[in-house]
């Protein structure tokens, strides 16, 4: 069977198109790929593989230029053929939701995979493993899924006239957007609309998912990230409306925030993070909120866990803690609320439902800098930045490291260095590599060396999180943490 015939057959079987539409669909494909593809045969069977072959044929026929951007634009246009229009996707979702919210979510997740919006083939390239630590097993990933632009495309992007449409990658206007060299193609993108606390929000999946069913909840309006009482209301509303999913927010200040601060959004999904499994190491009750179970969890960052069957109580208490933290200083442990009116304190909040109760984890954040730590006092320090120097956002806070692609080769190079196969490593890894070599001077087995290096990466990630923690895991640090808790007000009954 020809490539076009096979692709069109798949489109008909996996969409609302019918056999009568075959000629129409064939012509839609030829218009995008080029008529020279008509006689091309294929032995591929899967829809996404067929799409990929059509894209390569378009490059061969010079219908599109040989660039990553052109490939992505054509690929999303082809997959748009198997994707219902936004109104139909939303209608299907809410009709299914009326009978089973879980089924509605599952159907939308399956659609987002089937139409290649979630890049399963790319995500499969990621390296992922677990490492033991004093805080339980942590998750390490080396992110290889996001394609890196080649130098030619980066140069072209600099010459492209600035555009404010869409305003950012999280705006609703991305739905169906054609794409350009400096903005991703989104022809096959669909967003579920829903109302939350009186405003329109959107629900979509992340194309380059970091964990199972990684999704994004985005404000219908282009408004900046802001942690407030409304954040706690919305996060708890999400975990109630989207059963089985957690929901969390990045912090809203530089250094301790995420990569997108210009558009209010939350992340969620169906994944149990290491932090969720962390036990309470100290429990107490806050005054006026005696019915809310509260405590500090055993975690490298500073986390208060609140549990209750009352959303209202959790929202009120979380807001009280947040407001107190924003203005709280303790010079004995280098904690400062503001400098000349510039705030330093915020929270990374995470919500979930567990055993029928609502749960909020409030991670205390401080974005101060100093002469010794110009990148951030509570940010990965210089000696661990060879592994992780980016902001510690929501996902890392919960115990999942997202490490840069360079580490794939660099980890292997350090392992080769340990067994004497390589004489050099990257300059920024030299001290680390020498330290490992002195600890394991007689290593000859490359696989064993690789395991040692990967475990060491995990140990460094623990340090990264400890650096980001405002109250350290020391007697002084934990005593200071309790001073803050007492400042909020605990029940002495």
Curated annotation (Swiss-Prot):
The keyword Transferase applies. GO terms for biological process: galactose metabolic process. Pathway: Carbohydrate metabolism; galactose metabolism. It comes from the Bacteria. One of its GO terms (cellular component) is cytoplasm. InterPro entries: GalP_uridyl_Trfase_II (IPR000766), GalP_uridyl_Trfase_II_CS (IPR023425), GalP_Utransf_C (IPR005850), GalP_Utransf_N (IPR005849). Belongs to the galactose-1-phosphate uridylyltransferase type 2 family. PANTHER family: DUF4922 DOMAIN-CONTAINING PROTEIN, GALACTOSE-1-PHOSPHATE URIDYLYLTRANSFERASE. This is Galactose-1-phosphate uridylyltransferase. It comes from Streptococcus pneumoniae (strain CGSP14).
């Amino acid at each position: 069977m020809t490539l076009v015939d096979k692709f069109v057959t798949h489109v008909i079987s996996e969409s609302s198109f019918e056999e009568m539409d075959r000629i129409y669909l064939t012509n839609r494909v030829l218009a995008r790929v080029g008529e020279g593809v008509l006689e091309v045969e294929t032995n591929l069977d899967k829809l996404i593989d067929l799409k990929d072959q059509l894209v390569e044929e378009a490059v061969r026929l010079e219908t599109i230029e040989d660039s990553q951007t052109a490939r992505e634009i054509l690929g999303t246009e082809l997959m748009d053929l198997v994707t219902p229009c936004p109104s139909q996707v939303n209608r299907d979702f809410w009709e299914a939701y009326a009978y089973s919210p879980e089924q509605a979510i599952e159907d939308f997740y399956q659609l987002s995979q089937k139409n290649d919006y979630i890049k399963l083939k790319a995500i499969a390239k990621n390296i992922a493993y677990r490492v033991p630590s004093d805080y339980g097993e942590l998750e390490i990933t080396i992110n290889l899924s996001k394609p890196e632009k080649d130098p030619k495309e980066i140069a072209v992007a600099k010459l492209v006239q600035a555009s404010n449409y869409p305003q950012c990658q999280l705006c609703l206007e991305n739905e169906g957007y054609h794409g350009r060299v400096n903005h991703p193609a989104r022809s096959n993108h669909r967003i579920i609309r829903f109302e939350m606390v009186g405003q329109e929000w959107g629900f979509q999946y992340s194309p380059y998912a970091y964990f199972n069913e990684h999704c994004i909840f985005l404000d219908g309006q282009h408004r900046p990230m802001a942690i407030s009482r409304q954040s706690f209301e919305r996060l708890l509303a999400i975990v109630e409306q989207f059963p089985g999913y957690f929901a969390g927010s990045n912090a809203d200040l530089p250094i301790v925030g995420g990569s997108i601060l210009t558009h209010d959004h939350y992340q969620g999904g169906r994944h149990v993070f290491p932090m969720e499994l962390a036990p309470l190491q100290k429990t107490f009750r806050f005054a006026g909120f005696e019915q809310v179970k509260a405590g500090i969890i055993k975690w490298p960052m500073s986390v208060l866990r609140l549990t209750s069957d009352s959303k209202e109580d959790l929202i009120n208490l979380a807001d009280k803690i947040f407001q107190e933290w924003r203005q709280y200083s303790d010079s004995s442990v280098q904690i400062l609320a503001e400098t000349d009116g510039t705030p330093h304190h915020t929270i990374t909040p995470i919500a979930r439902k567990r055993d029928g109760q609502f749960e909020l984890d409030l991670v205390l954040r401080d974005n101060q800098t100093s002469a010794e730590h110009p990148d951030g006092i509570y940010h990965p320090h210089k000696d661990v930045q060879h592994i992780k120097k980016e902001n510690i956002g929501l996902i890392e806070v919960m115990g999942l490291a997202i490490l840069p692609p360079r580490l794939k080769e660099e980890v292997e190079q350090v392992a080769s260095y340990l067994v004497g196969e390589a004489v050099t490593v990257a300059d920024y890894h030299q001290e680390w590599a020498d330290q490992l070599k002195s600890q394991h001077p007689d290593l000859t087995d490359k696989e064993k060396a690789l395991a040692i290096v990967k475990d060491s990466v995990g140990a460094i990630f623990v340090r990264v999180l400890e650096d980001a923690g405002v109250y350290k895991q020391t007697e002084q640090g934990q005593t200071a943490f309790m001073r803050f808790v007492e400042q909020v007000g605990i029940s002495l009954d």
